[in-house]
Design a protein with these regions (language model features):
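Short glycine-rich hinge loops at helix-strand junctions in the catalytic core
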Residues: 105, 122, 145
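Conserved catalytic-core motifs of GNAT/GCN5-like acyltransferases
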Residues: 127-130, 142-185
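Active-site acidic-Proline motif in GNAT/NAT acetyltransferases
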Residues: 98-100, 104, 132-133
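Residues forming the Rossmann-fold NAD(P)(H) cofactor-binding site
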Residues: 104, 108, 112
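Conserved GNAT acetyl-CoA-binding A-motif
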Residues: 118-129
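Helix-turn-helix
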Residues: 137
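Acetyl-CoA-dependent GNAT
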Residues: 3, 7-99, 111-113, 117, ...
Length: 191
């Protein structure tokens, strides 16, 4: 099937709602969060992502009007969505593919387009983080040329508002023993 990848304008409210729902659904389907998780509202809030970063979507059909099957966020320097990037690095966040559309290479196509877009916008490097348990994502990023960067690893705990609190090493060790920590591993790619 033909597909189209394009940027989503912040004024495309219905598309942004669709993207938010798809993002939350993908994270739920993978068991990364449950319905009560404080991150769900942030996953659903594609409107904020589109206003403070570049949101890409893939839709079925050449006309760009079909259903959204995947999305990724390209985060520029200075955005409030930056978690890892420094200087003129860009960051990729919230790659999500419809659970019923997996196996079509959608994640790879979206990631490549996001990498290309970051370079078009002046990125010296592209960084991202992913949960330690997301082995399929690790393989995807490594196939696409991302290098594992232990210096970008970080450990967080969830806040009630859907944000995360970055922990010091000592705090992380304690939280990991208590089972409340989430360890994220970092990757980077240079054009």
């Amino acid at each position: 099937m033909a597909e189209t990848i394009r940027s989503v304008d912040p004024s495309e409210s219905s598309r942004l709602t669709e993207i938010g729902q798809l993002t939350a659904l993908a994270y739920l389907a993978d068991g990364l969060v449950d319905q009560a998780h404080p991150y769900i509202p942030q996953l659903k809030d594609a409107h904020t992502r589109a206003s403070d970063a570049e949101l890409l979507m893939m839709v079925d059909g050449e006309d760009g009007e079909g259903p959204v099957v995947g999305t990724i966020t390209v985060v520029p320097p200075g955005s409030s969505l930056v978690e890892l990037a420094t200087g003129d690095e860009f960051e990729l966040r919230m790659l999500a593919v419809s659970p019923i559309e997996r196996g079509r290479g959608i994640g790879a196509k979206l990631t490549q387009r996001a990498m290309d877009r970051a370079v078009e916008l002046g990125a010296s490097r592209v960084v991202l983080s992913t949960m330690e348990t997301m082995h399929v994502a690790h393989r995807l990023y490594e196939r696409m040329g991302f290098q594992r960067r232990e210096d970008l690893d970080w450990t967080v705990i969830d806040n009630d508002d859907g944000t995360v609190q970055r922990l010091s090493r000592a705090e992380a060790d304690k939280a990991e023993r208590a089972g409340t920590a989430i360890h994220l591993i970092g990757y980077s790619w240079a054009p």
